[in-house]
Amino acid sequence: MHLYAAVDGRPTHAGAMVIVEERITFHGDIGVETGDVDVNATLVVMGSVDEGREVRVAHDLEVHGDVDRAHLEAGGSLTVTGSCVHSQLRAGGRQAVVRHLLAALGSTSEDLAVVATTVEHMVSSARDRGQQLPPGRALLALMEGPYAGVRTHMAEVEAVIDAHGAAMFPEGAVAAAHAVSHVVAGLGMHELTGVDQLRALIVTLADQEHALRTQLADPSAVRTAYLQACDVEASGDLVITGSGIFNSTIFVGGDLWVEGGRSTLRGGHAIVGGAMHVHELGGDGGARMDVELQGRTVTPDRLRADVVHPGVHVTINEYPVVFEDLRQGVALGADEEGHLLPQAA
C-alpha cells in the first residue's frame, strides 16, 4: 500500500494513523555527520550549527545553540538562542516570493468580477434575441478582446509558481491559480456551464489572495543573542537579546531592537526600515559606523541610543547626521513632512 501526503513534513505513526508533521525537531548539532539541511517545514534544532553548514527551511527555523560560519535561511522567522559568528542569516524569503506572486496577480480578482458580470449580460442578451451563447465562449471573446490583460496576468502568475516551485505557496492558492488560468486560457471553455461556476472560481482566487496578503502583515523576524561579523537580512524586525552586534552588515525591513542590558551596535553597516533602539552606538577610537533609516516613518524617536560615540554616521529620511563627539541620551526622528527632529545631537 502506498500513502501520499497532502503536505510536506515528517511522517510519524500515531496508533493506526500516519500523521505528517510540518514541524520537525532535530536533537543534536547540524555538522559534518548530518550535512546540509533543506526541508519544506518548520525546523527546530536542539543544538548548534557548525562551520560550513547550510540550513534552509520553507517555514520557521529555531536553533537552540550557537551558529558558527554557517548559512541559515528561513522562509519565515529565524531564532538563534545563542551567538552567531561569521554567518549569513536570512528570514522572510517566503514573503518575498509571495510579494512576487501578488505583483504578478495585480488587479486580476477585481477584473474577473467585472468579467463575470459582462459574461452574464452577454449570455442574457443573446437569449433575448433567441440565440444561445455558451458562457465559455463569451468568456473567451472577452479574454481575446478587452480583457486580454487578465490572461496575461494569470500567465505571469503561473510563471512565478513554476519559477519558485509550488511548494513555496499554500496549496489552496496554487490550486485556485491553476483553475482560473485554465479557464481564462480557453482550455476550460467547454467545462464552464454557467456564470455561477465562474464566480465561484473568482471568489476562491480572491480568498486565497486575501490569505496571502495576511501573511505579509506579519513580517518575518530574526532573533538572536549576539552577532559578530555576520550578514543579516530580515523582512521584519531584528531583535538582539544579548551583548549586541559587532562589525556586521544588517538589512531589516522592520525595527532593530538591541535589548541586552548594556547592548552595543558597533562597526559595520545597518539599514533599517523602521525604528532603532540601542544602548550604545559605535565604539571607542572613532571607528566609522553607518546607520541608514530608510522610509518616512513619522516619530520623534525613530533612533534612540543611550550613548553615541564619535564616528557614527546616521542617515534619516535622507538627512545625514555625523557624530563627532560623545553624546548621551540621543533621539532622532522626523515630522510629518519628513524634516529631521534632532532632540539631542
In which residue ranges do the predicted regions lie?
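Charge-rich, low-hydrophobicity low-complexity segments
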Residues: 1-46, 88-345
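Basic (Lys/Arg-enriched) interaction patch that binds polyanionic ligands
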Residues: 38-75, 81, 269
